[in-house]
């Protein structure tokens, strides 16, 4: 199994709000993406940073985001080999 790790840095109701955070993350050197998701609570756009090779790199990124007052979640995507 091969896994990639990501940090979800925000959930937003509007694309414009997600884009604002994306631009902030680009300013500090990340290459974030916006994903359109369906949710029951109305948050339709998430901002994702990564992929990272391991949880340690993901945790470092999450700590950097925390210093910028951005909460984040760890996300993992695994594929069987």
Predicted segment positions?
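Conserved beta3-strand ATP-binding lysine motif
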Residues: 10
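Extracytoplasmic
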Residues: 1-3, 13-81
